[in-house]
């Protein structure tokens, strides 16, 4: 989860954002950093799967194959995400991409195709949720008494096949983080194993 990563990276930034509720101001920039790249990819995937599940929750092999052949449709999902997340314009507007933005757009389309090809191997499956916010309160006994905190995050996607619920966490780049200690490997698992992730 992003909040946990923010805490591990910089506790003061975590406090300002998640405890005090302060947000960093939106910057108007032509640049696409890795966080924005990931956000655009996430929204593109969500738009694609929202369309795929418009008539039912089950994703069939034929649906994915048809979408994989439709480059115009895939580009339209990415364009919609760019309009919302980078350009901050209405869906009807047609912003002009600069060279770097155009390259990033094509890379995101290729990532989206790879996601669809990966999911093709898993079909048929049922879409359970996308971009689902989860949180759990945990009470820890300390020397000063019990201390309660809330851990939370957003699950990119949950889908199901037969009796298996799959949690999908999209990764679009960056170098793999090496945990400083063994505890960091298991903390996020607490959220994913809580008793009610599938409302």
Language model features by range: what are they?
Residues 1-3, 19-31, 53, 59-64, ...:
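Glycine- and acidic
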Residues 10, 41, 151-176, 194:
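Conserved catalytic cores of phosphodiester-cleaving nucleases, focusing on short active-site segments
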Residues 192-199:
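Conserved small/polar residues in nucleotide/adenosyl-binding loops
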Residues 1-49:
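C-terminal, charged and often intrinsically disordered regions of DNA end-processing helicases
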Residues 13, 22, 47, 51, ...:
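Short loop/turn segments at secondary-structure transitions that flank enzyme active sites
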Residues 44-133, 137-138:
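A non-catalytic, helix-rich entry segment at domain boundaries
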Residues 128-161:
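Active-site metal-binding core of divalent-cation-utilizing nuclease and nuclease-like domains
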Residues 6, 129, 167-169:
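A structural signal for short, well-ordered beta-strand segments and their strand-loop junctions
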């Amino acid at each position: 989860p992003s909040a946990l990563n923010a805490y591990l990276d910089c506790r003061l930034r975590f406090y300002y954002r998640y405890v005090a509720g302060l947000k960093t101001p939106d910057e108007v920039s032509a640049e696409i950093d890795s966080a924005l790249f990931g956000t655009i990819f996430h929204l593109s995937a969500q738009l694609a799967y929202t369309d795929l599940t418009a008539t039912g929750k089950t994703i069939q092999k034929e649906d994915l194959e048809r979408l994989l052949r439709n480059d115009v449709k895939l580009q339209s999902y990415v364009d919609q995400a760019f309009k919302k997340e980078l350009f901050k314009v209405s869906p009807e507007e047609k912003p002009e991409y600069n060279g770097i933005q155009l390259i990033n757009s094509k890379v995101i389309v290729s990532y989206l195709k790879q996601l669809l090809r990966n999911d093709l191997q898993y079909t048929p499956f049922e879409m359970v949720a996308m971009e689902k916010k989860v949180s759990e309160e945990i009470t820890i006994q300390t020397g000063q008494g019990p201390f309660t905190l809330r851990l939370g995050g957003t699950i990119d996607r949950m889908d199901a096949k037969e009796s298996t619920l799959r949690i999908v966490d999209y990764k679009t780049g960056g170098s793999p983080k090496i945990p400083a200690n063994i505890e960091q490997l298991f903390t996020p698992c607490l959220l994913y194993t809580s008793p009610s992730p599938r409302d």
